[in-house]
C-alpha cells in the first residue's frame, strides 16, 4: 500500500513538472516558419530514378519514388495533388513529373512512397470556353516553370485554359482559387 502511494505521488509530481513545459511547447511549435517551406519541392520523387540501384529492382513503376506534390497539413485526413494520370491502378501515382498534360486536382488517399492502389479519389478541373468531361479530353498543357509545389501551397498556370490555379490544404479539406485571365464561360468539372 505504501509503495502504491509513493508511486502515485511521484506520478503526480512528474505530471506537474512536465505538463507546463508541454503546453508552452505546443504554443511555440504550432507556428509555421513560412520561409522554410520555400526549400521543399514536393515534386521530388515523381520522376524515374537515375541511380544504378533503382534499376536492380525493375524498369517499370519501381524506379519511381511514388511521391506526389500534395498539399496538406501534417497528419491530415486527406490531401490534394495535381493529377496527370486518371487511374487508381496499383503502382501508378496520380502525378508524374515527366507528364506534360494536367487533368485536374485530385483528392487522394495515395500512400506516398508505396506501390499500392489509390482509392476513393475525386478530381476537380477548372475549364474555360468549352465543357469537356472526360479526363483525356479535358487534359491541358502545363509547364514546370510556371508550377510551384510546396506542402502548404500548389500553383500552376494553364495557358490553354487561360487559368491560373492555386490550392492549399487543410486537415480535412482544401481551398482553391481559379483566376480566369479572359472573360467567357468558365466551368468546374467534378
Residues of each region from the PLM?
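Bacterial Sec-dependent signal peptides at the C-terminal "C-region" and cleavage site
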Residues: 18-32
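Secreted/extracellular small peptides and ectodomain modules produced from precursors
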Residues: 7-8, 23, 27, 113
Amino acid at each position: 500500500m505504501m509503495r502504491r502511494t509513493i508511486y502515485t505521488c511521484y506520478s503526480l509530481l512528474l505530471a506537474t513538472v512536465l505538463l507546463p513545459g508541454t503546453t508552452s511547447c505546443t504554443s511555440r511549435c504550432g507556428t509555421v516558419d513560412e520561409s522554410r517551406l520555400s526549400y521543399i519541392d514536393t515534386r521530388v520523387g515523381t520522376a524515374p530514378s537515375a541511380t544504378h540501384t533503382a534499376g536492380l529492382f525493375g524498369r517499370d513503376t519501381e524506379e519511381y519514388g511514388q511521391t506526389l506534390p500534395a498539399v496538406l497539413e501534417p497528419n491530415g485526413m486527406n490531401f490534394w495533388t495535381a493529377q496527370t494520370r486518371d487511374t487508381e491502378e496499383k503502382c501508378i501515382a496520380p502525378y508524374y513529373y515527366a507528364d506534360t498534360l494536367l487533368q485536374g486536382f485530385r483528392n487522394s488517399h495515395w500512400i506516398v512512397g508505396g506501390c499500392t492502389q489509390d482509392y476513393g479519389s475525386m478530381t476537380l478541373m477548372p475549364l474555360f470556353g468549352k465543357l469537356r468531361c472526360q479526363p483525356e479530353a479535358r487534359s491541358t498543357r502545363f509547364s514546370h516553370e510556371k508550377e510551384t509545389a510546396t506542402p502548404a501551397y500548389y500553383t500552376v498556370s494553364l495557358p490553354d485554359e487561360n487559368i491560373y490555379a492555386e490550392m492549399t490544404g487543410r486537415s480535412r479539406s482544401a481551398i482553391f482559387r481559379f483566376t480566369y485571365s479572359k472573360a467567357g464561360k468558365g466551368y468546374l468539372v467534378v
